[in-house]
Amino acid sequence: MEYKRFKTRQIKVGNVLIGGDAPISVQSMLFTKTRDIEGSLEQINRLYFAGANIVRLACLDMADARALKEIKAKSPLPLIVDIHFNHNLAVYCAEFIDGVRINPGNIGSKENIKEVVKACKERGIPIRIGINHGSIEKQFSDKFGYGVDAMLESAMYNIKLLEDLDFFDIKISMKTSDAQKTIEAYERLRPLCDYPFHLGVTEAGTKFHSTVKSSIALGNLLLKGIGDTMRVSMTGELEEEIRVARAILQDSGVQKSGVNIISCPTCGRIQSDLLSAIKIVEEKTKHIKEPLNISVMGCVVNALGEAKGADVAIAFGKNQGLVIRHGEVVAKLKESELVDRFLAEVEDEVKSRAVKE
């Protein structure tokens, strides 16, 4: 299946391009109190090393806003301020931040939005219209309830409001906590505008539930060419948000990066400690950003076939096994020596590619 992405307008968040032909970026949001400068910077740095492109922070009051200014000066990543209820905080933060997210359901009057637009326009920073099914404006929820129809009405109303103010650096999100409704919301809005979309399932839950919901919703949309930036929302799992997001991009075939591990589910034919080997391989290869296919198989039934499509592979047998690189056996070793040799071949493969580039 050929992947064809919907062509959107391009905006810029700090040094990250979103939309157009830019790669799909991965975002996360801190769970620190923003006034905790040291703690916030610690989480930002963790996200930076995990492979995030953009970070969002909550701003509840002026103490948060002043702290955010200091955090921004030290952050290795572009920062977006997340504003609810108090538009004055958005106006203040627009002086130094890379982007503003507003919730139309609680930001207040048109005059409030005008002030935010004016501040962002002067700085040349984008605004995300963050539609959330749980906080739709009363004028739309009274008429349509809290479903997708109300979300679409809110989105189009707020897009027009910004456009009428001659503001077009816009990004849009249409988040619900339900995978099917999220897919429907983005699909129905896509033909109605050409602004970049920020994908996400809101309040998706802990690691297990979030991974399932986000994979269904985001993977489905990405395969249809919808989406320019994304977040996998996960309760209390910063690095895992990035890891799962990157895996969705990779396994949907949209964006290749990092290691793709092929491993068998195990059965009665296994005569080795495959589970321990897989855990070691996952941990030792998670730092690799180069697109790489590796295979760790427990017996000969599918091992050699999988190895032909892998850059580096292990085929375990009884007390011994093979290390295979690009379909060629490079070593036959005792089981205790296999993983170390395999990892050495993986690192050598990464280095050899770097030299070629």
From Swiss-Prot:
Enzyme class: oxidoreductase
Annotated [4Fe-4S] cluster binding sites: 264, 267, 299, 306
EC number, as in UniProt: 1.17.7.3
Coiled-coil region list: none
UniProt entry keywords in alphabetical sequence: 4Fe-4S, Iron, Iron-sulfur, Isoprene biosynthesis, Metal-binding, Oxidoreductase
Pfam families reported for this sequence: GcpE (PF04551)
Keyword Iron tagged: yes
Pathway this chain belongs to: Isoprenoid biosynthesis; isopentenyl diphosphate biosynthesis via DXP pathway; isopentenyl diphosphate from 1-deoxy-D-xylulose 5-phosphate: step 5/6
GO BP field: isopentenyl diphosphate biosynthetic process, methylerythritol 4-phosphate pathway; terpenoid biosynthetic process
Secreted is among the record's keywords: no
Catalytic activity: (2E)-4-hydroxy-3-methylbut-2-enyl diphosphate + oxidized [flavodoxin] + H2O + 2 H(+) = 2-C-methyl-D-erythritol 2,4-cyclic diphosphate + reduced [flavodoxin]
Cofactor binding note of this UniProt entry: Binds 1 [4Fe-4S] cluster.
Signal peptide: none
GO molecular function ontology, one term from the record: 4-hydroxy-3-methylbut-2-enyl-diphosphate synthase activity (flavodoxin)
Cofactor needs: [4Fe-4S] cluster
Family: Belongs to the IspG family.
Function field: Converts 2C-methyl-D-erythritol 2,4-cyclodiphosphate (ME-2,4cPP) into 1-hydroxy-2-methyl-2-(E)-butenyl 4-diphosphate.
Name listed for the protein in its UniProt record: 4-hydroxy-3-methylbut-2-en-1-yl diphosphate synthase (flavodoxin)
Species, as recorded: Campylobacter jejuni (strain RM1221)
Gene name as annotated: ispG
